[in-house]
């Protein structure tokens, strides 16, 4: 039986691909060496210890239909579209060695005429003109008996969209968690016009086979054609859940404020595990009672716009004589938290 395994995903769903990756990693034989190749449609992928509200413009992502996906490895936030090729190398220990997988990617690029080098924070860089530019970023995960190295290659990504989604709104947010380091990047198409996913995928496959002097047939994975992956349904449910993608954020505080014709309001939130642990409201309104009641209602609520909107609607029902003013406040609060 071959020690190599090659898997290719036909799905562009980040939650599907990350669930497949996690299941294969848990269930692989310790003597196997696995290469998994995949792509995600519009997605921001964050590291295991990151805070999405700090890293991302969550409101813009929701407006544009961009998914958020938290991976199980560390590292920073990245934007994926179909101009990226994603790779994952897995191996049991002591065979797992991220320098080997890095070399395979470098060999694949060299076979296409692209000279890249490993640099700094798990990056691959090229010289573009007089500048050194990043074309690949990676992250890693290790357990007692195995490890994986996964990353992306920028082929023809829409780099203008990085700034749209990887910069948070200018909110008054004091947050713990790992902050992404922004790098100067370039697409491989700038160096090799005509490069596409199929070409780079084939080059990586061939470099993988050449390194280990062995070839295997690819297993193509899709939602309609899953390999035997016990626990996949549960893992996909986790990867796609708000509780994992948002609720795993480290504790943080958030202050929002605005002014209406009837008075100004300022809300202080302490958020823990994606829920409002403490809420304080300050106001110069002549009738602060409804706002004090809102602060009490928000205690313990999930820190997500739909949950807060539902609470606000019940709150408004308690003060029918102030419906217009409280609807204003509700609409503002739900929008500012997106």
Swiss-Prot record:
Residues 29-216 form the BPL/LPL catalytic domain. It catalyses: L-lysyl-[lipoyl-carrier protein] + (R)-lipoate + ATP = N(6)-[(R)-lipoyl]-L-lysyl-[lipoyl-carrier protein] + AMP + diphosphate + H(+). Its EC number is 6.3.1.20. It is an enzyme of class 6 (ligase). Belongs to the LplA family. Its main location: cytoplasm. InterPro entries: aa-tRNA-synth_II/BPL/LPL, BPL_LPL_catalytic, Lipoate_ligase_A, Lipoate_protein_ligase_C, LipoylTrfase_LipoateP_Ligase. Catalyzes both the ATP-dependent activation of exogenously supplied lipoate to lipoyl-AMP and the transfer of the activated lipoyl onto the lipoyl domains of lipoate-dependent enzymes. In the transfer reaction, the free carboxyl group of lipoic acid is attached via an amide linkage to the epsilon-amino group of a specific lysine residue of lipoyl domains of lipoate-dependent enzymes. This is Lipoate-protein ligase A. GO terms for molecular function: ATP binding; lipoate-protein ligase activity; lipoyltransferase activity. Pathway: Protein modification; protein lipoylation via exogenous pathway; protein N(6)-(lipoyl)lysine from lipoate: step 1/2; Protein modification; protein lipoylation via exogenous pathway; protein N(6)-(lipoyl)lysine from lipoate: step 2/2. Monomer. It holds the Pfam family Lip_prot_lig_C. (R)-lipoate binds at residue 134. CDD domains: LplA (cd16443). ATP binds at residues 71, 76-79, 134. One of its GO terms (biological process) is protein modification process. GO terms for cellular component: cytosol. The keyword Cytoplasm applies. It is found in: Cytoplasm. Keywords: ATP-binding, Cytoplasm, Ligase, Nucleotide-binding.
């Amino acid at each position: 039986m071959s020690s190599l395994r090659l898997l290719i995903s036909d799905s562009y769903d980040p939650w599907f691909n990350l669930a497949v990756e996690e299941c294969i990693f848990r269930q692989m034989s310790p003597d196997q060496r696995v290469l998994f190749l995949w792509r995600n449609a519009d997605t921001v992928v964050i590291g295991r210890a990151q805070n999405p509200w700090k890293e991302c413009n969550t409101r813009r992502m929701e407006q544009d239909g961009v998914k958020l996906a938290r991976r199980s490895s560390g590292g920073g936030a990245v934007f994926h579209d179909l101009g990226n090729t994603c790779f994952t190398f897995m191996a049991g220990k002591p065979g797992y060695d991220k320098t080997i997988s890095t070399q395979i990617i470098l060999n694949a690029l060299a076979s296409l005429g692209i000279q890249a080098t490993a640099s700094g924070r798990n990056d691959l860089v090229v010289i573009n003109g007089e500048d050194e530019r990043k074309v690949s970023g990676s992250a890693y995960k290790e357990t007692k008996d195995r490890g994986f190295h996964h990353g992306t290659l920028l082929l023809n990504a829409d780099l203008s969209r990085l700034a749209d989604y990887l910069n948070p709104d200018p909110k008054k947010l004091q947050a713990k968690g790992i902050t992404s380091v922004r790098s100067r990047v370039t697409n491989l198409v700038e160096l090799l016009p005509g490069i596409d996913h199929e070409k780079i995928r084939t080059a990586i496959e061939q470099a993988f086979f050449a390194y280990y002097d062995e070839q295997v047939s690819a297993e193509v994975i899709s939602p309609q054609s899953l390999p035997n992956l016990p626990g996949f349904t549960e893992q996909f449910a986790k990867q796609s859940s708000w509780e994992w993608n948002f609720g795993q954020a480290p504790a943080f505080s958030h202050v929002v404020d605005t002014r209406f014709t009837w008075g100004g309001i300022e809300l202080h939130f302490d958020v823990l595990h994606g829920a409002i642990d403490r809420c304080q409201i300050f106001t110069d309104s002549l009738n602060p009672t409804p706002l004090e009641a809102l602060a009490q209602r928000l205690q313990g609520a999930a820190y997500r716009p739909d949950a807060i909107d539902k609470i606000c609607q019940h709150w408004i029902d308690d003060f029918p004589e102030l419906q217009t003013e409280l609807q204003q406040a509700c609409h503002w609060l739900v929008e500012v938290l997106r």
